[in-house]
């Protein structure tokens, strides 16, 4: 089934009005994307809190209409519905159903991280390399955005876990994923040989997503999820926290206390330029602190002092 697609730019403040107008004139679907994606101004949208729908400052809004819709009449109807909005920057084009589906799926291709780790959407066949006997494959819903491996902070943490496995530091260990989101990091650790993973997040939605992904990957028996206030007090040989720099600063003492003596920690969700203060913040507890960069994002790793 073909469609007529209207694409335009808007701000977070005007997005509800644009979307309301589009739906009123018969849009079949409306998709929101970061207008600054793949640029230095790209914004990370982390797992939302309950009842929250965080958006980017500037968005690309794409609406699909039936193929026989008249673009000029649609534009006139939109201008009549909300004449205060600027509709002049919108552009129309005809798209085939298979083109739309392919464009969506192309955003979520199988991805490899390091020597063994693969993140593969459910709708894709396993690449040949991911079928190797020692491949660590995590299957995720392609509808996931942040926490699907596509963001540099997630990729930095996945590569770190992969290297721990290569170095023999992950097998049979317990792993804490603090700020687990979709559970992608904890699941990767399990697939790489960890014995057990604990996922902690302050968002109940994230815990549901993590538990669901664990079950779909056959890891429900080894994955346990908790709200922060319910997390058992324990230490772990491996701790990973992919959250915001401000949270990493505020939680430094707590996270340090969760790492066993000689254990490893990885911190991400850190923009380039923020790593200096965090390196100093964690220095009282960790040796061999290192910062690794991927584009505009950083990862800090260290070894817990005995």
Swiss-Prot record:
Please list the GO terms describing molecular function.
protein-lysine N-methyltransferase activity
What EC number(s) has UniProt assigned to this enzyme?
A: 2.1.1.-
> Taxonomically, which superkingdom?
Bacteria
Q: Which GO terms describe its cellular component?
A: cytosol
Which residues bind S-adenosyl-L-methionine per the record? 154, 179, 201, 242
Q: Where in the cell is it found?
A: Cytoplasm
Q: What is its main location?
A: cytoplasm
**Entry's Gene Ontology BP terms:** methylation
Its UniProt entry gives the catalysed reaction(s) as:
L-lysyl-[protein] + 3 S-adenosyl-L-methionine = N(6),N(6),N(6)-trimethyl-L-lysyl-[protein] + 3 S-adenosyl-L-homocysteine + 3 H(+)
Query: Does the keyword field hold Transferase?
Result: yes
Q: Which UniProt keywords apply?
A: Cytoplasm, Methyltransferase, S-adenosyl-L-methionine, Transferase
Q: Does the keyword Methyltransferase apply?
A: yes
Q: Which NCBIfam families match?
A: prmA
Q: Which family does it belong to?
A: Belongs to the methyltransferase superfamily. PrmA family.
Q: Which HAMAP family match?
A: Methyltr_PrmA
What function is annotated for this protein?
Answer: Methylates ribosomal protein L11.
In Swiss-Prot or TrEMBL terms, this protein is called Ribosomal protein L11 methyltransferase
């Amino acid at each position: 089934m073909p469609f007529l697609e209207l694409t335009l730019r808007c701000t977070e403040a005007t997005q509800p009005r644009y979307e309301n107008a589009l739906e009123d004139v018969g849009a079949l679907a409306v998709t929101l994307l970061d207008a600054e994606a793949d640029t230095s101004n790209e914004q990370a949208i982390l797992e939302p809190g309950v009842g929250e729908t965080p958006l980017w400052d500037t968005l690309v809004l794409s609406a699909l209409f039936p193929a026989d819709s008249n673009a000029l009449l649609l534009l006139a109807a939109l201008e009549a519905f909300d004449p205060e909005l600027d509709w002049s920057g919108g552009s129309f084009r005809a798209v085939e159903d298979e083109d739309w589906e392919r464009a969506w799926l192309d955003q979520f291709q199988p991805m490899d991280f390091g020597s063994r780790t693969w993140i593969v959407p459910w709708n894709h066949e396993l690449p040949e390399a991911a079928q190797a006997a020692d491949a660590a494959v995590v299957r995720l819903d392609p509808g996931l955005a942040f926490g699907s491996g596509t963001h540099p902070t997630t990729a930095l943490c996945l590569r770190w876990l992969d290297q721990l496995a290569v170095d023999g530091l992950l097998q049979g260990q317990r792993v804490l994923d603090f700020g687990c989101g979709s559970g992608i990091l904890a699941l990767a650790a399990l697939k790489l040989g960890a014995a057990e993973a604990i996922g902690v997040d302050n968002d109940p939605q994230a815990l549901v997503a993590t538990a669901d992904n664990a079950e779909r990957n056959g890891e429900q028996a080894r994955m346990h999820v908790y709200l922060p206030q319910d997390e058992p007090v324990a230490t772990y040989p491996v701790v990973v926290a992919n959250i915001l720099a401000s949270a990493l600063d505020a939680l430094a003492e707590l996270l340090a206390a969760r790492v066993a003596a000689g254990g490893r920690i990885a911190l991400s969700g850190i923009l380039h330029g923020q790593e200096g203060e965090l390196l100093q913040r964690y220095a009282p507890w960790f040796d061999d602190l290192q910062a690794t960069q991927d584009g505009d994002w950083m990862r800090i790793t260290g070894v817990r002092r005995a």
